Amino acid sequence: MSSLKEQKELFVSNLLGGSISETYNVTAVALSAYLSYNLISSYLDYKITFPVDFILNCMTILLSITLYSNSTNTLHLLILVPGILAAIVGRWGQKDVKKSRSKKPRDAKGTKTEKQLLVKKPFITAYRSHMLVITNFAILAVDFRMFPRRFAKVETWGTSLMDLGVGSFVFSMGLASSRAIIKQRFDSSKSTDYRFKLSQYVSLIMKNSIKTLPVLALGLIRLVSVKTLEYQEHVTEYGVHWNFFITLGLLPIFFGIIDPVLNFVPRFVVALVICIGYEVLMVKTDLLSFILRSDNRMESLVTMNKEGIFSFIGYFSIFIFGQSFGSFVLTGFKTPNNLFRMCSYQQYKKAGAKSGLFTVTSTQGLLIATLFSQALFWYVQEAYFVSSISRRLANLSYVLWVVSYNSTLLLGYNLIESVVAKPEAADSKILNAFNNNGLLSFLLGNLLTGLTNMTINTLGCNAPVTFAILVTYGLVLSIIAVTLDRYGIYIKL
């Protein structure tokens, strides 16, 4: 009879995944929750309490991947009805609602400041936090029988909720990291035309390397813990020694290495070249078979970790794609040609009030990016010369799937905020807390997942016990995040 460790490993192995359309429908529950939350907070004179906040922004997502995984449309309806009723009641009781929801005053003409450039946008907070919530729930839920196997990571070829989640986490990191770049570029006291200097280049790489040491240390700690505690592992996911924290830790280092290129070439072009080049290398050489073969696993350190090493190329491409969205998603006003590049203060002053073809608002930019990325993804899907979607490889199809999905999701959040939300009324403490301590919340989720697996036979839990554990887990993460946020404790790894 096999050990419990072997049973758990088998439970997450050789899976085939589900459909792309179902993945969209399930994750769109977060959009329904965001819409309902905004309708309630915008149209009712009601300050949303922590329990209601938790139910709308966490419980609904948990329900979508457990109890309502086979009836997602019903869940959408159950979530939206309270919001729609709130809007009806609010409009009925407030005759001057249109006056109160009049258009925002236009910004005064003149030169904008750095503070006006990087304003807080609730829809980005909701997007990043909901992504983190569903990721944290999934990494624990996958070890229970209640979690549908079609949502778990596939072995090699195919799509699933968790496969999408990994790439989306990296995309979100890229988007968030672009904030510092935009700020630096627009800083009037520092902003000058880029000139390559070896000393600055080396300094940037060293700075990024030092900054990422804590995340790489977490990767090492996870490796040692898994090996010494006999924790279940899925070798074909990243390899014998590699793990997701190592991938996350290496991203800023390689970003620093290609920094000179990014100062001259639009980020989305660089990302496309990387993932297309990687795809060509796989299909035109023996690299694809080298990665997928099982008989060469123990030949060297490289073959032991071949999935982690080569999939890093795809994740790096996703990271840069995420950064490319920052120039029009994070900014509070339009800057010259922000669809393709991050603007310096001199470029902004020189352009003045001119608005070119590639100067867009957040909504316009997201609409263009969504149409382009979706069209490119579906073309690649049908192309005979491109390999099928594989998170294990992080190939071209996978990269474009992740980018097109996140662009579509961001557009959805943006439209909800633009049409429905009153930013001052739709402030979720839970979403703000997760957004402010994102990587730490992800780390806590991993630690609690490990602790749960070490103390409980997850495969032996029935549905009620499983759901109770997952609710408690989500509640603990939310309380910790909100408490840290309340006292201004932010840990940036």
From Swiss-Prot:
Biological source species: Debaryomyces hansenii (strain ATCC 36239 / CBS 767 / BCRC 21394 / JCM 1990 / NBRC 0083 / IGC 2968)
Protein name: GPI-anchored wall transfer protein 1
Enzyme Commission designation: 2.3.-.-
An example Gene Ontology biological process: GPI anchor biosynthetic process
Molecular function GO labels: glucosaminyl-phosphatidylinositol O-acyltransferase activity
Subcellular location: Endoplasmic reticulum membrane
Top enzyme category: transferase
Family: Belongs to the PIGW family.
Lineage: Eukaryota, Fungi, Dikarya, Ascomycota, Saccharomycotina
UniProt pathway annotation: Glycolipid biosynthesis; glycosylphosphatidylinositol-anchor biosynthesis
TM segment ranges: 15-35, 48-68, 70-90, 122-142, 156-176, 201-221, 244-264, 268-288, 309-329, 366-386, 396-416, 439-459, 464-484
Glycosylation sites recorded in the entry for this protein: 395
Function: Probable acetyltransferase, which acetylates the inositol ring of phosphatidylinositol during biosynthesis of GPI-anchor.
